[in-house]
């Protein structure tokens, strides 16, 4: 896809991978609608922020209507990035935290995709990028809830791919390994460090899959740091 002057909706833009993705898209000339809880400090006429909790369908639907009304152009790109994780044994996990993870990581992906897919189907074009995790490929001790959400993201994405390809819509899942962001702030057993990937590395992966040719469909991409424990 040629990215310049296309509209992208990116969720979870306040920090980390979402913020890096917004900046990378803006550098490519993309008009970006950023959906999130807190507005990032971005001064660019092509960036438009819409405050939304993606785990709330009414807010997502309202954000999509506001985006469509303000920008008045079709959406070719959706990056479902919003996500969070909490560390706890399965037995001791608080119900509220469990529900929050599934509401944001899984329901949010469903809600955002649900409101935007119909318009992509009309165009018979579009690309949805779902950010999963290597935690969606193998269980991790103390991270059952988070792993559960990311396994769900991968399964949902595989079904979306099979359903939407016939409508000319690409669906790509990206599974990052450890990334040096504040995602790890509530996780006591892991400290973010320079041996991890940068958020910008994941953003580059997103740009790569978006720029593939029309009949080239990257379905799933796993990216990891080369030396996670240093030299």
Which residues fall in each region the model found?
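The beta1-alpha1 cofactor-binding region of Rossmann-like NAD(H)/NADP(H)-dependent oxidoreductases
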Residues: 52-62, 95
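Residue(s) in the substrate-gating loop at a strand-loop-helix junction
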Residues: 133
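Substrate-binding pocket helix/loop in short-chain dehydrogenase/reductase
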Residues: 89-90, 97-99
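Alpha-helical segment proximal to the catalytic Tyr-Lys
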Residues: 118, 158, 162-166
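Active-site helix of classical SDR
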Residues: 113, 149
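C-terminal helical subdomain
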Residues: 169, 173-174, 181, 189-231
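Conserved glycine-rich cofactor-binding loop
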Residues: 7, 14-15
